[in-house]
UniProtKB/Swiss-Prot annotation:
Catalyzes the reversible interconversion of serine and glycine with tetrahydrofolate (THF) serving as the one-carbon carrier. This reaction serves as the major source of one-carbon groups required for the biosynthesis of purines, thymidylate, methionine, and other important biomolecules. Also exhibits THF-independent aldolase activity toward beta-hydroxyamino acids, producing glycine and aldehydes, via a retro-aldol mechanism. It catalyses: (6R)-5,10-methylene-5,6,7,8-tetrahydrofolate + glycine + H2O = (6S)-5,6,7,8-tetrahydrofolate + L-serine. (6S)-5,6,7,8-tetrahydrofolate binds at residues 119, 123-125, 351-353. The keyword Amino-acid biosynthesis applies. It comes from the Bacteria. GO terms for cellular component: cytosol. HAMAP family: SHMT (MF_00051). SUPFAM superfamilies: PLP-dependent transferases. Its cofactor is pyridoxal 5'-phosphate. Belongs to the SHMT family. It comes from Clostridium perfringens (strain 13 / Type A). The modification N6-(pyridoxal phosphate)lysine is found at residue 228. This is Serine hydroxymethyltransferase.
Length: 410
């Protein structure tokens, strides 16, 4: 991209933008919630649409001059409905957290009981964490993973639902590597008269391409981000049954947001179009293949994988047998050019700022073109770095740079 105007106007910011570009180009990105957008998505984000304020919805705006952005938003809505087979879509949420908030405000009152996945077992802050608005406003009861299998035990979820009679059951996760059974969760919700909301922020790309079962036929509401496996701009979206469309839209605007970000909605529309192409399914298939190979390679080096593997794009690694914390592993690997994040593991004994594990994802490196052989090399580099954490890391930095040079970012 051309940043001539930025360089003339603000050298400091232009310099930092360039530094970040170089960091991304010369690092192996394993953060499961990150990806690299296409140039088309990036151009939409930096377009003239950023100038337009458009409170309301297409044909029902509070400002004039919205006929063009109405077309943009309609395109985004229609494309994402086609992508997921949904009855209604709202593409205005600024983030996944705000998408979840809008659903809660649509069907809950403060103090209502909600069943959601424990953050330390792979859930998300907005699924009831006490430090988040969700845990402060609503009475969340948490379910987790089985101590032995480290996967969701649906009978335990059912028992909790029968005991606490939640008004809403929340499914989905930020660090869960296995298939989620939405049909069974729908049956549990029906048994106790609860709504079902599924947060597919991490697995949206897999769901869109049929590589993970879709929650759309079963859930009352489906929320997502657009910047993870969907490979779009940072933002959120909500899908729902038509009967909830009016109340949902009201709880985005005027409920929790004002004017939508029309340049971001345009970029969402572009990413939905890209996701409808056959090449996107090929990409997502490679994401999953890469995750499987990377998981197997790490396991061969003696790393303990939570639930012993993965069905999707991410791997949760328990480092308790490697004499290193998640925090120290994150810092160590960052120093050689591999970026990932510390993460709690089931039955965690350390604080969330230290943790016993790391979370690894393959979407971003797959976007660059990395395939199975590169996964084996990445596993080898990670293993060598942790084994030689107090030694000379320069050879490992060189191996990382060699991989990055082989697959340019843009």
């Amino acid at each position: 991209m051309n940043f001539d105007n930025l360089e003339r106007e603000d050298e400091q910011i232009a310099h930092l933008v360039q530094k970040e570009k170089e960091r991304q180009e010369n690092s192996i990105e394993l953060i499961a919630s990150e990806n690299f957008v296409s140039k088309a998505v990036m151009e939409a984000m930096g377009s003239y649409l950023t100038n337009k304020y458009a409170e309301g919805y297409p044909s029902k705006r509070y400002y004039g001059g919205c006929h063009v952005v109405d077309e943009v938003e309609d395109l985004a809505r229609e494309r994402v409905k086609k992508l997921f087979g949904a009855e209604h879509a709202n593409v205005q949420p600024h983030s996944g957290s705000q998408a979840n908030m809008a659903v809660y405000f649509s069907i809950l009152e403060p103090g209502d009981t909600v069943l959601g996945m424990d953050l330390s077992h792979g859930g998300h802050l907005t699924h009831g964490s006490s430090v988040n608005f969700s845990g402060r406003l609503f009475n969340f009861v948490s379910y987790g993973v089985d101590k032995e299998t480290e996967t969701i035990n649906y009978e335990t979820v059912r028992e909790l639902a029968l005991k606490h009679k939640p008004k809403l059951i929340v499914a989905g996760a930020s660090a869960y590597s296995r298939i989620i059974d939405f049909k069974t969760l729908r049956e549990i919700a029906d048994e106790v008269g609860a709504y079902l909301m599924v947060d597919i922020a991490h697995i949206a790309g897999l769901v869109a391409t049929g590589l993970h079962p879709s929650p759309v036929p079963y859930a009352d509401f489906v929320t997502s981000t657009t910047h993870k496996t969907l490979r779009g701009p940072r933002g959120g979206l909500i899908l729902c049954k038509e009967k909830f469309a009016k109340v949902l839209d009201k709880n985005i605007f005027p409920g929790i947001q004002g004017g939508p970000l029309m340049h971001i909605i345009a970029a969402k529309a572009v990413c939905f179009k890209e996701a409808l192409e056959p090449s996107f399914k090929t990409y997502m298939e490679q994401v999953v293949k890469n995750a499987h190979v990377l998981a197997e390679a790490l396991e061969a080096y003696g790393f303990k994988l939570v639930s012993n593997g993965t069905d999707n794009h991410l791997i949760l690694v328990d480092l308790t047998n490697k004499d290193i914390t998640g925090k120290d592993a994150e810092i160590l690997l960052d120093s050689i050019g591999i970026t990932l994040n510390k993460n709690t593991v089931p039955n965690e004994t350390r604080s969330p700022f230290v943790t016993s594990g790391v979370r690894i994802g393959t979407p971003a490196i797959t976007t660059r073109g990395f395939k199975e052989e590169e996964m084996k090399e990445i596993a080898s580099i990670i293993n060598d770095a942790i084994k030689e954490k107090d030694g000379d890391l320069e050879p490992l930095k060189a191996r990382v740079k060699a991989l990055c040079a082989k697959y340019p970012l843009y």
